[in-house]
Each structure stands twice: as C-alpha cells, then as structure tokens.
Amino acid sequence: MNKQLANKPQIKAILGLGNPGPKFYFTPHNIGFLIVDAVCEQFNGTWQEKKDFISATISINDQSILLVKPQTFMNNSGQILGQLHKQGIKQENMLVVHDEIDFVFGKISLKQGGSARGHNGLRSLIAHGGDAFLRLRVGVGRPEEASQVAHFVTARFQESEQEVQELIVQAVQDINKLLTP
C-alpha cells in the first residue's frame, strides 16, 4: 500500500465491491469480493445471506467489523448504504475494497474520499451517501482499447490464479495493517 493516513479511521464495515453469481466470481470487477472473502476466512467469519447483501461479523482487536458483499450488482452497490446506516455505520467508518483499472495489476493504494473516476460501483455509493468512505484501490490493469473495459472487468483474470492469490494476500495484509494499532 503506497499511502499512509495521518490518522487511522475507526473502520466498522468493510465493503467488497463485485457482482453476484458464479459467472463473475474470478473476474477483475470482483476483486473486492475476493479480498473480503479472504478477510472473512482469516478471522473465522461466517457469511449470512440477507435480502440485498451477504455479511459476516468478525472481531479484530476486540472490535467488531461487519464484512459486506452487496448482491445488487456493481452499478447499484450504493443501495446497501441504507441498511448500514440503520446499523449505525456511517460512510466515514467504511472501507470500500474495489478494482482500479487505472492502476497496473498488483498496485494497491489507500484513498480517502474523492470522485468515482468512472467506476460505476463507486458512483452508486457516492450518489446514495457521499464520498466520505475510505477506499482500498486494487490495481487490475486496463485493456488496450477503451471500448473493451466492460468486457475486461467482467471476464476472467488474464493473470494466473497464483498471481491473483498473491494480490489478494497483499491486500489482506494491507487491511490488517490499517485495522491494527
């Protein structure tokens, strides 16, 4: 992770962005789901299905953290914010893990706030509640042709499964650093 925050935010929820269903499982757009799955496994969480999302609660340093995978498809990810708000989770207490096509595969960066930069999942979150959330931007690369972006992010990774797993491990390590004192 190439950026450190002056003050570590109190994270109460980690949202992994992606699309539901086996068709999209191992795709660049689902890197958020894959990383949150790995966090859940590391901390022995158990996924529970709700109407529009899947969630698990984990404990890190005696702090409960809600892991969330919206099931509304990427472009409607922001619909989850109402449910999180009812649970007392504000945007400034959320870490959103998402694919970043403007980064080469493997680059990971932490960013507070900002625009969607063309990412429809972020656009939906911002439209439903603002941009105060923290982002873990995970580089998945970009196709040579701009017209191929939609296909690129929803097709299987071009990188090997091992390379993707190494990226997931690095992202989980970065999340652990963020969450531990």
Can you say where each PLM-predicted feature lies in the sequence?
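Nucleotide and nucleotide-moiety/phosphate-recognizing core
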Residues: 1-113, 123, 127-134, 143-150, ...
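Hydrophobic alpha-helical segments within soluble ligand-binding/sensing domains
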Residues: 118-121
